[in-house]
A protein has these predicted regions:
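Short hydrophobic beta/alpha edge segments that flank linear recognition/processing sites
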Residues: 18-20, 52-67
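Short, well-structured beta-strand-loop connectors
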Residues: 1-7, 45-60
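Generic, low-specificity signal for short hydrophobic/alpha-helical stretches with a mild N-terminal bias
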Residues: 2, 18, 58, 88-92
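Residue-level detector of functional hotspots within protein domains
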Residues: 4-6, 25, 60-64, 92-95
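Acidic, glycine-rich catalytic/binding loops that coordinate metals and/or anionic ligands
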Residues: 46-52, 62, 69-132
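Alpha-helical context
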Residues: 27, 33-36, 54, 85-90
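Zn2+-dependent peptidoglycan hydrolase active-site motif and core
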Residues: 1-41, 73-75
Length: 132
């Protein structure tokens, strides 16, 4: 992802979420945020810290004790914040509010190989059949 500043870190039900605000990367895009959820942030990742493209900010949260039986995964969201957004008290409900953030499809900006898994995918079936 692009360089930015950590604006919020908060608990989610599997770990912690990190919100990064990125400055304009092109004049047509403007400011945007990226959210990385279900993580364990590195000790040096705190609100106000500048992060650079390629920095390791966190590891995946251990979900083995989750009552929901969810496999470890990264929840990644991308959006454009409103001009009036406040990061104080930022939680997942903030991400759902279109008056505060307009969500965008993050897949076009991921510059690494990825695979979107569907419930019927053989890898999904194999992973779900294992005890974790």
């Amino acid at each position: 992802m692009h360089n930015g500043v950590v604006k919020a870190i908060f608990k989610d039900y599997l770990g912690r979420a990190i919100i990064i605000e990125h400055e304009k990367i092109e004049s047509s895009i403007g400011k945007f945020i990226s959210a990385y959820a279900h993580t364990n942030p590195q000790a040096d990742i705190k609100v106000g810290v500048r992060v650079k493209e390629g920095d390791i900010m966190a590891t995946l949260a251990d979900t083995s004790h989750s009552k929901a039986h969810i496999l470890p995964h990264l929840h990644f969201s991308l959006g454009r914040p409103s001009e009036s957004i406040s990061y104080e008290g930022f939680v997942w409900n903030t991400m759902r509010n279109p008056e505060k953030i307009i969500l965008a499809d993050p897949l076009p900006v991921i510059d690494r190989p990825y695979q979107a898994l569907e419930a019927g995918n053989s890898l999904c079936r194999e992973l779900w059949s294992q005890k974790f």
